[in-house]
Amino acid sequence: MSTNGQDSNANNNDTIEIQETEVVPVETTNSLQSGLTSLIPMVLIFAVFYFLLLRPQEKRRKEREKLVSEVKKGEEVLTNSGIYGIVTKVSESEPNIEVEIAKDVRIKALKSAIVDITSRSKDVAVKKEDSKNNKKDKKVSGAKSS
């Protein structure tokens, strides 16, 4: 009988019982919501990137295009290679300008090479300096009269 008992134990050890499981449908709303919530940080990062980098760069580009398009004969300019000169010839049909860098020394440069119109910058600087001096004079004269 002991041999039959061992055989029945061996049969019990060799068998694996599989239990039935229920198939539960996955809720589609939860997966859709989790997909949208993971998309929100990416949208925020793009928005920050746009407002901190792309938008200011676009503004600077437009200002530069306006500056280059308004160059006139007789203005003092600075090129991106560091050359100061006075514009002697501007052509609307060509992208070039002629700049006099010394007496009877003229070079051709691209309009896009203009970094600054220094004669305009000087005018603005002089106006700011004058307004500061006027304010100081008013303060000094006001202090002396009292």
UniProtKB/Swiss-Prot annotation:
Quote the subcellular location field of this record: Cell inner membrane
Give a single Pfam family match: YajC
Q: How does it assemble?
A: Part of the SecDF-YidC-YajC translocase complex. The SecDF-YidC-YajC translocase forms a supercomplex with SecYEG, called the holo-translocon (HTL).
**UniProt keyword Acyltransferase, yes or no:** no
A single cellular component GO annotation: plasma membrane
Q: Kindly give the membrane topology term recorded for this protein.
A: Single-pass membrane protein
Composition bias (Basic and acidic residues) maps to: 125-134
Please classify the protein's predominant subcellular localization into one broad category.
membrane
Tell me, what does this protein do in biology?
The SecYEG-SecDF-YajC-YidC holo-translocon (HTL) protein secretase/insertase is a supercomplex required for protein secretion, insertion of proteins into membranes, and assembly of membrane protein complexes. While the SecYEG complex is essential for assembly of a number of proteins and complexes, the SecDF-YajC-YidC subcomplex facilitates these functions.
For the region Disordered, give the residue spans. 125-146
Q: What are the UniProt keywords, alphabetically?
A: Cell inner membrane, Cell membrane, Membrane, Protein transport, Translocation, Transmembrane, Transmembrane helix, Transport
**The protein, known as:** Sec translocon accessory complex subunit YajC
List, in alphabetical order, the GO biological process terms annotated in this UniProt record: protein transport
Q: Give me the segments passing through the membrane.
A: 34-54
Q: Which family does it belong to?
A: Belongs to the YajC family.
